UniProtKB/Swiss-Prot annotation:
Cofactor list: pyridoxal 5'-phosphate
Assigned protein family: Belongs to the class-II pyridoxal-phosphate-dependent aminotransferase family. Histidinol-phosphate aminotransferase subfamily.
The species this protein was found in: Mycobacterium leprae (strain TN)
Catalytic activity: L-histidinol phosphate + 2-oxoglutarate = 3-(imidazol-4-yl)-2-oxopropyl phosphate + L-glutamate
GO MF terms held by the record: histidinol-phosphate transaminase activity; pyridoxal phosphate binding
Subunit architecture: Homodimer.
Superkingdom field: Bacteria
Alphabetized SUPFAM superfamilies for the sequence: PLP-dependent transferases
Annotated InterPro entries: Aminotransferase_I/II_large, HisP_aminotrans, PyrdxlP-dep_Trfase, PyrdxlP-dep_Trfase_major, PyrdxlP-dep_Trfase_small
PTM sites of type N6-(pyridoxal phosphate)lysine: 230
Biological process annotations from GO: L-histidine biosynthetic process
Entry's EC annotation: 2.6.1.9
Name by which UniProt lists this protein: Histidinol-phosphate aminotransferase
Protein encoded by which gene: hisC
Length: 377
């Protein structure tokens, strides 16, 4: 008897998962990948050799569980952040996990959940509502200004009126690229009833001071999350972390799975941190390339949202999906983030950006492009 292959509809899924699609950017084999905001500069030979040696050293103990609390890695992260932000931090201020998404999930497991709510200011990072849904946290949202910047007055009012347990702010914001000032964060923190999560995935690119500066000032209200997947060029290593007061770090111990960070991940990440200066040396070059791309797009007649990250949001296309397909047909993969009329492009290597700009100039001569020169917003 042949039994039909079951589908998702045949499974006893939770109701809130029915009809959903898995999250994830396209992974296609094309010459130019500018869709996931990675650092395009590969690791140095010295870093690769260090990772190999470090992993080889722990491999003899792979029959044993790793350090459950990743103390040595967290100490290294604290030292890195102290040097990077100028704010003295210790191991007690740091928590680490498999990418910043796991960090965000743990935060909502601890501070969200059934009967609680989280608010975001859209468009922003699309995983925030997905993680809220996955933890049964009610998702609330307020729309950003027409230029995609955060309307702080509206945000303060929304938080004061709706009293969410968790507030999400991405700075720089993905997909628009704007950062928020410490003064504006203080205004929000003064009305936040629960915790404010400042998602600094692109923090190393930002021209503004890190929100880490506010941890001592608002010890029970603020958590800063970061990743090594962007400027730090360690996307394949899958490491995210948070910075907070020790009590908030302790809360993560209540929800984290035991031995969640493998000994291989911990060893490789510690090796990568030893080469932080070399890796982050590419940030200035990427910012310069971002500005070159921005000026070129504006010259072609596109509207470009000023960015403080390693990507640009640009438009306004009459048919964003058609424009995205044209880029792909020329071997350039960028991101359609679902904002009508806009696409997002990662800043790549100079030759990758040249290919992107060539495709952009072709689109500028078609009916897909803006009808008039709008310039930077």
């Amino acid at each position: 008897m042949n039994v039909p292959e079951p589908t998702l509809d045949d499974l006893p899924l939770r109701d809130n998962l029915r009809g959903k699609s898995p999250y994830g950017a396209m992974q296609l084999l094309v010459p130019v990948l500018l869709n996931t905001n990675e650092n395009p500069h590969p690791p140095t030979k010295a870093l690769v050799d260090d990772v190999v040696r470090s992993v080889q050293k722990v491999a003899v103990d792979l029959h044993r569980y790793p350090d459950r609390d990743a103390v040595a890695l967290r100490q290294d992260l604290a030292s890195y952040l102290t040097a990077q932000t100028g704010i003295r931090l210790g191991v007690e201020n740091i928590w680490a996990a498999n990418g910043s998404n796991e960090i965000l999930q743990q935060l909502l497991q601890a501070f969200g959940g059934p009967g609680r709510s989280a608010i975001g200011f859209v468009p922003s990072y699309s995983m925030h509502p997905i993680i809220a849904d996955g933890t049964h946290t009610e998702w609330l949202e307020t729309v950003r200004a027409d230029d995609f910047s955060l309307d702080v007055e509206a945000a303060v009012t929304a938080v004061a009126d709706r009293k969410p347990d968790v507030v999400f702010i991405a700075s720089p914001n993905n997909p628009s690229g704007q950062s928020i000032s410490l003064a504006d964060l203080r205004r929000l923190l003064d009305v936040v009833p629960g915790i404010l999560i400042v998602d600094e995935a692109y923090g190393e690119f930002s021209s503004r001071p890190s929100a880490v500066a506010l941890v001592g000032e608002y010890p029970t209200k603020i958590v800063v999350t970061r990743t090594t997947s962007k400027a730090f060029a360690f996307a394949g290593g899958r490491l995210g972390y948070l910075i907070a007061t020790p009590a908030l770090v302790e809360a993560m111990l209540l929800v984290r799975l035991p031995y969640h960070l493998s000994s291989v991940t911990q060893a490789a990440a510690r090796a990568a941190l030893r080469h932080a200066d070399d890796t982050l040396g590419s940030v200035a070059a990427l910012i310069a390339e971002r500005e070159r791309v921005t000026k070129s797009l504006v010259h072609m007649g596109f509207r470009v949202i000023p960015s403080d990250a390693n990507f640009v949001l640009f438009g306004h296309f009459s048919d964003a999906a058609g424009a995205w397909q044209h880029y792909l047909d020329t071997g350039v993969l960028i991101r359609d983030v679902g904002i009508p009329g806009y696409l997002r492009a990662t800043t790549g290597l100079a030759e990758e950006n040249d290919a992107f700009l060539k495709a952009s100039s072709e689109i500028a001569a078609t009916e897909l492009a803006p009808a008039t020169t709008l310039g930077a917003s």
